[in-house]
Amino acid sequence: MQALSITLAKRIVGDSAFQNIAAWLAIGAVACLMGCSAMNAQNPSGNLKPVNAHVIDGTSHVMLKGHDVVSYFTQNKHAMGSAQFASVYEGVNFYFANAEHKALFDKEPSKYLPQYGGYCANGIVYGIPWGGDADSWMMLGGKLYMFGGQGSRDGFLLDVPGNTALADKYWREEVAGSNSFWQRTKRLTLRVPHYKSGKQLADEVAAKKAKGQGLRAEG
């Protein structure tokens, strides 16, 4: 009976689609079993979700592993915050390096929030909320963008206007308000039409640099 059901399902949706769906469900099941703590940390109860947050010393929903989001704006660098100077905004815990930065954030929190919940901006281009390292970032138009490393940052810089537009679109239409683990699983299985692998991006970056064309952010 089970074999017959699988055969019928394949006929209805197609073998390739069936394999994608099966993989999606399998990966999702593993994520639920192995990543409950991380899933909870990245999906708080407030409106600011999903977020690149972690459990730090028993405190859940800590943005960017406790790094000070205000330091990027005031000192043009990343700095570790402290639980001594902490604020809670939309169910997310933010740590700051000093009382001055905490006060600035408390006065206007939306000004200092990293784009796309603090996830790697280049991942959001493909609808995938993951990554986002405190020491890999850039400012564009007065906004803070995080990346999962130099390779991701360079990939985004290949086409800043186009990639920003795509990231804005997928964040607005798919990622914002979703469960990060399910969204990630979906878009790793059912990839967007413009998806590029890390190797493809690295090759494009290398080709551009070989032509003497630099990679730089505007704004």
Predicted regions and their residues:
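Intrinsically disordered, low-complexity terminal tails and linkers in eukaryotic proteins, enriched
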Residues: 37-90, 113-219
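Mid-length scaffold segments of soluble, non-membrane domains
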Residues: 90-120
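N-terminal secretory signal peptides that target proteins for export/translocation
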Residues: 1-19
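Short, surface-exposed beta-strand/loop "edge" segments at domain boundaries and coil↔beta transitions
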Residues: 2, 103, 153-155
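Bacterial N-terminal signal peptides
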Residues: 24-33
